Regions:
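Membrane-embedded transport module
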Residues: 15-173, 186-191
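C-terminal transmembrane module of polytopic membrane proteins
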Residues: 135-240
Length: 240
């Protein structure tokens, strides 16, 4: 029991003494060590996938905060309605995060979870907020929903690229997930009932060009941020 107390991870057999099981972190109910690889895989999946999903949520928190601050300072109206935020969140965070969190991930635990997550999420959030504000400023109404639509789609293009980054390495099912997100994003604008529900309008040719340019720049900058900040932090964590 004393040895288990001092161990990094105490493992006790189910048929062991009560004192041993009381101090152990893991108790093998059937007293078989053969179940440990499965326990290890489950732990790795939870920790590694938490890092993936956290980047998506923290990036959203960052760009929402930046948008509030900037629009308040410059006197612009906020680019999005609450229902439009639901549209963005569902397609770039909620639905993809559900599948990413459940998928197996064999990557071993690497210290520095919070620093790595913030090193990707915070720069990305600033980039996505800048993309939304740029498109919002370039595209003119009326109606006002025209500006919001451009801001939504520009931000979502960058957010989808963040989803690509957090999904790496890409497998068949992840390509299917990404294709579904992109199809739903475009479909939400093209399908009239959905478009009207989220108070969006069909972009003109010029507006599609603006959206594509701003969104592509946002995606490129997100990739650069990942390589400069996150990849370096991850390498240092491995070396440390």
């Amino acid at each position: 029991a004393l040895a288990l107390k001092d161990a990094d991870l105490g493992i006790a057999m189910g048929n062991g003494t009560q004192a041993t099981k009381a101090v152990a972190q893991i108790v093998l109910v059937d007293s078989k060590f053969s179940v440990l690889p499965g326990v290890l895989s489950e732990g790795r999946r939870i920790i590694a996938n938490m890092e993936r999903v956290s980047s998506l949520f923290l990036a959203k928190t960052t760009y929402a905060a930046v948008l509030v601050i900037v629009t308040a300072l410059v006197g612009w109206r906020y680019p999005f309605l609450p229902r439009q935020f639901s549209y963005i969140d569902s397609l770039t965070i909620g639905i993809p995060a559900f599948f990413l969190a459940l998928w197996p991930n064999p990557r071993r635990y690497v210290p520095g979870f919070l620093k790595r997550t913030l090193s990707l999420a915070m720069p990305t959030g600033v980039i996505l907020a800048a993309a939304a504000l740029t498109a919002f400023g370039i595209v003119d109404g009326p109606p006002q929903s025209r500006e919001s639509t451009a801001a939504i789609l520009s931000l979502m293009l960058g957010a989808i690229w963040l989803l690509v980054i957090t999904s790496r390495p890409l497998s068949t099912w992840k390509w299917v997930l990404l294709a579904s997100v992109i199809s739903a994003t475009v479909g939400g604008v093209l399908i009239a009932p959905v478009r009207h529900f989220f108070s969006m309008v069909a972009p003109t040719g010029h507006e599609w060009f603006v959206i594509a340019c701003v969104g592509a720049c946002a995606a490129l900058l997100v990739e650069v941020a990942q390589r400069i900040f996150y990849a370096r932090k991850f390498k240092r964590s491995l070396e440390g």
